[in-house]
């Protein structure tokens, strides 16, 4: 982390703690507001987590097939999230007002199936929770 990256990227080389990461997710769920203050505009959050890929782009066969892509993360329905280095995952669901994280420390992140298993379990739980909310 002492050397500048060849290509500047918003998430490239970021180092954080689970506490700070969760705070960031809380801010997203608050549409830019945390601890009673706006640290980001609501519009910036809404645009950043929305699907920014034009409908004319064919995603067939790509890693984004069936999903959208916001500013640095995947957008699927009311859920927005992304994966990081060393196997980490983070997501927020705006309809259910939930946030979730997976913290691991191994590289490459594909070395173990835990990310895929976590995503599958999370999506199943979210589907159940949406169904319960709809039925209520």
Predicted regions and their residues:
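Catalytic loop of the DD-peptidase/beta-lactamase superfamily, centered on the K-T-G motif
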Residues: 1-136
């Amino acid at each position: 982390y002492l050397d500048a990256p060849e290509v500047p990227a918003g998430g490239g080389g970021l180092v954080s703690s689970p506490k700070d990461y969760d705070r960031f997710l809380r801010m997203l769920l608050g549409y830019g507001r945390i601890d009673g203050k706006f640290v980001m505009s609501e519009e910036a959050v809404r645009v950043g987590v929305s699907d920014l890929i034009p409908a004319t782009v064919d995603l067939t066969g790509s890693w984004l097939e069936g999903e959208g892509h916001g500013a640095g993360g995947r957008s699927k329905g009311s859920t927005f999230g992304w994966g990081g280095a060393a196997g980490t995952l983070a997501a927020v669901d705006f309809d259910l007002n939930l946030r979730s994280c997976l913290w691991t420390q191994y590289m490459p992140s594909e070395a173990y199936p835990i990310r895929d298993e976590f995503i599958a379990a999370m999506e199943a739980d979210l589907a159940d929770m949406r169904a319960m909310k709809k039925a209520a």
